[in-house]
Amino acid sequence: MQRQKQNNSALWLVLGGAFVLRMLLATVTKGYPYDMSCFVAWGEKLLADGPAGFYSDGYFADYPPGYLLILGLVALVRRIFAIPYEAKLTYVLLAMVPSLCDCAAAALVWKIGQEKLPGSRLPLLLAAFVAFDPLLLFDSAVWKQIDGAFALPLLLCFYLLEKRRYLPAALLFGAALAIKPQALLFGPVLAVCFLTAIVQEENRFRAFLRCFGGAALALLPPLALGLPFFGAANLLPGLLEKYAGTAASYPYATINGFNWLAALGGNWTPLENPVLLGITWKQLGFFNILLVTLGLVYLAARSVRAGRFSPLLLAAYYGLGIFTLAHCMHERYMVPGVVLTLLAAARWDDIRLFAVGFGMSLTGFINLCTVYSLTGSDDEWLTSATSSSVAILVGLAETVCFVLLLFGVWDIVANGHTLPLPARMAEAAAPPAAPAPQPKWQRKEILALLALTAATAVVSFAYLGSRTAPQNPLDATGTTLTETVTAEGGTAALWVYPGISYGGRLTVADAAGTTLYEKELDYSTCFSWTSVELYDDAGEVFHITVENAQVFELALRSADGALVPVTGGGALFDEQTAVPEAISQLNSMYFDEIYHGRTGYEQLHCLPVYETTHPPLGKDFIMLGIALFGMTAFGWRFAGTLFGVLLVPLAWCFVRRLTRRPWAAAMAGVLLALDFMRFSQSRLATIDIYGTFFILLGAYCMVWYCQRVLAVGVNGAVLPMALGGLAFGLGCAAKWTGIYAGAGLAVLYLGVLYARWRQGQPGFGREFRTAFLGGIAFYVVLPLSIYIASYLPYWWRDPGFGLADWWRCQVSMYNYHSTLEATHPFESRWYTWLLGLRPVWYYRNAYLPAGLKASIAGMAGPVIWLGGLAALLWLLWRQVSGRGSYAGAGVLILYGTQLIPWMLVSRCTFLYHYFPSSMFCLAALALVLATAQDQRRAKRLGAALCAAALVLFVWYYPALSGLPIAAWRADLLNLLPSFGFY
């Protein structure tokens, strides 16, 4: 009885938390605009014109009357309280009923689980998964659709059919039908359930009559609710037109539903188009529907004979079978089938059904995210190479899940064989024990770590950039300066190396004053060599005018490429020995270096800074590199490359502490040393490498802290606590993504405190005080102090710079990021990052001979990103199925808190934003291998992964470094249509 009360309390806590989370998500997201505008407009029209005037001629309203009453109620509340359309409260009101229905579905899963496994914690685990299912969360709270309200009566219908309560089930089916026409997709399952009752019951005549009663009850809700809208005379024609018109309004193979037809390339393809051997998509869809329906009849007949007839199981099979194989499927049509699968998992205590529900929740979540995030963009119809790849890959994954469901259903129906869910999570059953001690560092391991770090440094610093560049500019900022120069030989080209400009101009004129060349100098031209044709004879005099800009150097070249000696020119021609032999990334800025690298120079020279959209710490580090090596390509890239090298031993140490297996740590170090993103991102003078480094350092300190707390208590863990706060502060001061990491650190910080309390050690009150005060000191005060201190270069430039100015900087940063609407040809959404589908094309060398190409791309390292994704999914599955570990949970938390905020970002984003998250992909991969039962096989697999990473790194090195290669070889590197570099 006591356990039952605890389970009930826990259930209410889960449901309450799930509802609150949905309301928060509803508040911070705007919803799918087309559905939102329809729902609001329909409610207002119903309120204004009444039911009889709602379906007026020419007015678009493709929903039946069932849910319109709820929308009318929402409109009434908005009218009473004068709530505008754009108000957050409007979003909350629209999401409230579907969210409550989602929570009711979770409670139903719990109830079914309690009937199957009374007294077990498994029903609570299943209910928690449904309550926080990302597919349902996104559908109800973010998209703000009504599928939760539509699915609930369907779920209750098939639950009652399990109990053989046929007539109430039929009434509930009618309620679902009154809300959405998609209920008709489950009509064959309802019919099978009623017809099998004729076979199962002794009184077959009664069962036969019940079929008619059930049909009448199923039609009652649509008819009763439709009567005020259509009137008695037009009731049946009006309803039939509404249901038939909705079904025929989207004549495409699939309408953003990532299923088998999408995997075949059928998204938004007209139904009459041929797909194979003259067969149209429509014919293929109907054929598949016939197959799925015949399968339903066979499974029903087989299960009746075996005494294992289960409406929930059949409804799950049929709902997902239709979504996977039929035509005209929208992205959200899978929602009822997914929840039915989870109900069936509870009914049959089968982990395979749970796994399918888990897998399809993820594929459906990505499906909805893809459609939602691209709404209103140029890629709204998912026609780009990236979006098409996502649709195909997710469609394949969804199809695989359905095949697994089919095997599971067959095994249960035909053989009565189930694979029970684990009894309970073993670690949760007892207080957490003190972790095993860390293995001692051996000499050979230290030498291996040093050797790997040295090798990484050699590869990273090689071909990084020139250590020579012009340093003395002609500075015409705020004025206009003219220099006269005489060429001592024939000229063919003019090379220009501008500095900082706030909207300036370079003009070259001949002796007669005729303009030969004119170039706008702005933010995009700084510290980058450019070449233009400039043909003239020896002895020609040029008048060169610089207006409101810096120009560090000019150079004249002859037809054979040699430097042309000049007379005069002042500062424009005073460093000819610093002119490079060829223009490339080795001597010029590229991508966002024109913002961050330039700002490092400005900070060093106490100039007004250009880049103010990120905190300054990363640019402070760039400034130090410039101070050491001058304003050269090597100088502005030095600090980032150094941090990229140091990231490798840090990852080694992090994985070693996490897994306690030196071999896994060594594998992680090698994989990161060969990772594409680490290499290219660290050699680019931007700030992401610094944020990533400190995020991983903070994670290392937090794992260290957690282990110390469990071993010796909070009072013995002050050092990692303090160092973790230091790392957190540095990460926030480098980039705001460090704040995302803080959420994960906070969860682990509080979680280990709870775990320590569960250990029941004496003196916990003193430990709690230490944790509380230490948390304030080291994770609030210290990071804030570091963040403020990172603005010291601002104060050096302007001693009057104070806290009010600092605060205005923060407001400006927030406003910039929250209102940014810029687009970029190589932007990508978070769900494409998981597979690295859209690299960022950083640089193309336009000064190469024909037949050669050179590019730099920010790419995903296939081994870490793909292998890590598989490992993360495995850890997540272990966790939600009750078989996880504290280490696995920690990695998932750190990964999730780094990635999830990007799911809510609608601004332009890039693949490199996933770089910090990829550190925990690496940790997940190492953890899965380190905890494998067969360690010999795990080590062999780890070695194979390292070998694969080396081969891939060598193959893709030109695309990561900018090394010129033959054009045919470059074209081979564009492996996917979505790559697009070179």
Question: Which residues does each PLM region occupy?
Answer:
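Aromatic-rich transmembrane-lumenal/periplasmic boundary elements in polytopic membrane proteins
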Residues: 23-63, 69, 219-264, 561-600, ...
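Transmembrane-helix signature of polytopic, membrane-embedded enzymes
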Residues: 81-89, 100, 104, 109-134, ...
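Transmembrane-helix motifs of polytopic, lipid-linked glycan transferases
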Residues: 92-117, 156, 291-301, 638-659, ...
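Membrane-interface transmembrane helices that cradle and orient dolichyl/undecaprenyl
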Residues: 114-121, 155-168, 195-202, 349, ...
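Short acidic/glycine- and proline-prone juxtamembrane loop motifs at membrane-interface regions
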Residues: 141-147, 330, 636, 640, ...
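Perimembrane helix-loop-helix junctions
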Residues: 186-220, 231-232, 336, 701-712, ...
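Aromatic/glycine/proline-enriched transmembrane-helix motif characteristic
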Residues: 202, 242-324, 407-416, 840-894, ...
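Transmembrane helical bundles and short interhelical boundary loops of multi-pass, membrane-embedded
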Residues: 239-255, 298-301, 315, 319, ...
